[in-house]
């Protein structure tokens, strides 16, 4: 049974810390986005190879998360969190001393493998620590904290790049990891109260995940979430080159343009939090997916040579990604309350799998213009709508 809250924290502090854990992914990606062209030159490689470092990170994230969920269901959240964060710290330091693109790719994979512990256990601890009726609200509040990462990281990354070089960005990530590890070690109590009651082997990993995916509502929710994050990461991987190389925005100003869409996420999350208190979550999702459809069509109609025409649908799509996420996660936690770690691991892993596919497609088809990025995001919007339609059942809207 969930406990009222983590006994060594007040609820606000716990939400802020868990939101920071969930933000490990965007923080680790967005911090070095302004440096991608610089890294390509420093390591004597192509833009396509450096873009691959984003896909490599997403791969490591997906793989790591699939392990952390079931392991935390069995052995507890705290010890697994500390192990994953330790891997993240060491790998971040390895990234800073990489002298070739191959070394950077390996270090980024390991950094992601360790960092994947944050999104999985951050949300699983919410299920452990708060009553069911508060989960959507708590996840929405966590989302606001999480969004500080993509809002601040490009600004900080651009400044660090300008004054210290791209290597220091990874050292800063390692330092953030150390601070979070120390907080978890000294202040975070164990929240999984029945962790010793579950048998665990490789077969149960796959049985748990297959059991989740066999349920149409769970499959549809995960597909929707994966596609939305795929579009998000196509935007993340594409905009450094679109903004800096195509529209000639200075690297130190990139964070401002990136931050506009983060403001969209914050606004959409606040509006979503207001709406779910008054309407059924399924109704709110239906309205949000209608806006996703409009944004998807706008990507096809946008003039690729107009920065404003590109940024307007991006603002809508990226903002909606932040609003939709807590609603879908809440639905999954309610459907799989006795395997919260596994459910969050699968959902979060598939999120970043969608990001891997979308950013990989962008890297493969990239033609040094915004058009490819717009088409990839539009395709992701269509897949997300299909996923949402799968979740619809008779009486689901009124439930």
Language-model regions: role of each:
Residues 2-7, 191-221:
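Juxtamembrane intracellular "pre-TM" segments in multi-pass secondary transporters
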Residues 63-102:
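Conserved MFS/SLC helix-loop-helix module at the cytosolic interface between two early adjacent transmembrane helices
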Residues 87-94, 102-110, 308-314:
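Paired small-residue
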Residues 107-148:
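Cytoplasmic helix-loop-helix junction between adjacent transmembrane helices
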């Amino acid at each position: 049974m969930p406990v009222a809250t983590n006994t060594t924290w007040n609820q606000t502090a716990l939400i802020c810390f868990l939101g920071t854990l969930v933000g490990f992914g965007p923080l680790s990606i967005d911090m070095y986005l302004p440096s991608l062209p610089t890294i390509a030159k420093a390591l004597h490689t192509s833009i396509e190879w450096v873009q691959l470092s984003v896909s490599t990170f997403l791969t490591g994230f997906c793989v790591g998360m699939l392990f952390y969920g079931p392991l935390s269901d069995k052995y507890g959240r705290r010890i697994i969190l500390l192990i994953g964060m330790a891997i993240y710290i060491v790998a971040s330091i390895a990234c800073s001393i990489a002298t070739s693109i191959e070394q950077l790719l390996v270090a980024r994979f390991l950094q992601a493998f360790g960092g994947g512990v944050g999104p999985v256990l951050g949300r699983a601890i919410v299920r452990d620590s708060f009553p069911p009726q508060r989960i959507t609200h708590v996840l929405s509040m966590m989302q606001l904290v999480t969004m500080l990462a993509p809002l601040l990281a490009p600004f900080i990354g651009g400044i660090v790049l300008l004054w210290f070089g791209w290597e220091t960005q990874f050292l800063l990530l390692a330092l953030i990891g150390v601070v979070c590890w120390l907080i978890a070690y000294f202040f975070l109590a164990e929240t999984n109260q029945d962790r010793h009651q579950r048998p665990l082997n490789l077969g149960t990993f796959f049985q748990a995940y297959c059991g989740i995916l066999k349920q149409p509502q769970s499959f549809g929710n995960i597909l929707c979430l994966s596609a939305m994050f795929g579009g998000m990461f196509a935007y993340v991987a594409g905009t450094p080159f679109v903004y800096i190389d195509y529209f000639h925005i200075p690297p130190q100003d990139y964070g401002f343009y990136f931050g506009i869409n983060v403001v969209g996420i914050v606004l959409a999350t606040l509006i979503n939090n207001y709406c779910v208190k008054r309407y059924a979550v399924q109704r709110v999702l239906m309205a949000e997916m209608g806006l996703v459809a409009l944004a998807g069509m706008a990507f096809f109609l946008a003039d690729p040579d107009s920065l404003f025409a590109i940024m307007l649908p991006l603002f809508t799509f990226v903002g909606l990604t932040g609003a939709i996420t807590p609603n879908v996660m809440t639905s999954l936690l309610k459907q799989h309350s006795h395997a919260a770690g596994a459910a969050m691991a699968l959902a979060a892993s598939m999120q970043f799998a969608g990001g891997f596919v979308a950013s990989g497609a962008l890297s493969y088809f990239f033609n040094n213009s915004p058009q490819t990025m717009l088409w990839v995001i539009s395709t992701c919007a269509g897949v997300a709508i299909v996923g949402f339609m799968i979740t619809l059942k008779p009486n689901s809207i009124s439930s």
